[in-house]
């Protein structure tokens, strides 16, 4: 009897494991994908540059422009932001729109990476960092994040979103790492999008090599 009970418990445990959501699998971009991105129609979700982890965001943030209350880019992060922008231009990836979170680290990354962007940059307050929010507070932020990830992009151009790792983790279980990583997404409309691949900073040189 005891063996039968233990056996049924084991079967139940296996069923629970099999019913669990599949673990997210990160894929690295290759040159073939880069060629497709040059044709446009994608969203590039860029996690901000390297930050000073000795400074945590103060909650509530209050004024988004007050960088003294936020975790901000360090010098390495500022250089990384410039470098990622250069990589994107060297890859001849057309960018028609750059949106960024209102937090200083995302805003500064966008300004450093896309300083010469035609039409300028657009701050979207709804792209807030979600890690410090309650589940109820997260919902409108995730709705906005999903909206811009899923909104179709015209052929011949791409949309860039400069934001945070927790937002993507909340949406698809993918905590974007390291900082400065570009996540390539295929927007599908009506709130739907598909993860395609990632480009961490160290991958760019091999993608761009002759």
Where are these regions (language model features)?
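Bacterial N-terminal signal peptides
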Residues: 1-8
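Generic beta-sheet signal
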Residues: 41-43, 154-163
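Histidine-centered catalytic micro-motifs
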Residues: 46-51, 161-168
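Short, surface-exposed amphipathic charged segments that create phosphate/polyanion-binding patches used
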Residues: 135-143
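Active-site-proximal alpha-helix that buttresses catalytic centers in soluble enzyme cores
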Residues: 16-125, 130-133, 174-184, 188-210
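Glycine-rich phosphate-binding loop signature in dinucleotide/nucleotide-binding domains
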Residues: 91-93, 152-156
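A short, acidic, amphipathic alpha-helical segment used as a generic capping/interface helix at domain edges
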Residues: 143-153
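Sec/Tat signal peptide C-region and signal peptidase I cleavage site
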Residues: 11-15
């Amino acid at each position: 009897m005891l063996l039968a009970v233990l056996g049924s418990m084991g079967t139940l445990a296996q069923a629970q494991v099999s019913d669990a959501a599949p673990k997210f699998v990160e894929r690295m971009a290759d040159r073939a994908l880069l060629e497709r991105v040059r044709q446009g129609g994608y969203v590039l979700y860029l996690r901000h540059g390297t930050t000073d982890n000795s400074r945590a965001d103060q909650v509530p943030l209050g004024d988004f422009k007050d960088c003294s209350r936020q975790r901000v880019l360090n010098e390495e992060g500022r250089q990384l932001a410039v470098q990622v922008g250069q990589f994107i231009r060297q890859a001849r990836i057309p960018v028609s729109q750059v949106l960024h979170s209102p937090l200083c680290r995302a805003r500064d990354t966008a300004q450093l990476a896309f300083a010469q962007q035609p039409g300028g940059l657009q701050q979207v307050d709804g792209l807030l960092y979600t890690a410090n929010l309650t589940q109820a507070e997260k919902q409108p932020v995730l709705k906005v994040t999903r909206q811009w990830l899923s909104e179709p992009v015209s052929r011949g151009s791409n949309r860039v979103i400069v934001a945070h790792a927790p937002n993507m983790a909340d949406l698809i279980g993918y905590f974007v790492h390291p900082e400065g990583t570009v996540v390539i997404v295929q927007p599908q409309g009506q709130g739907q999008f598909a993860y395609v691949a990632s480009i961490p900073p160290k991958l760019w040189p091999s993608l761009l090599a002759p």
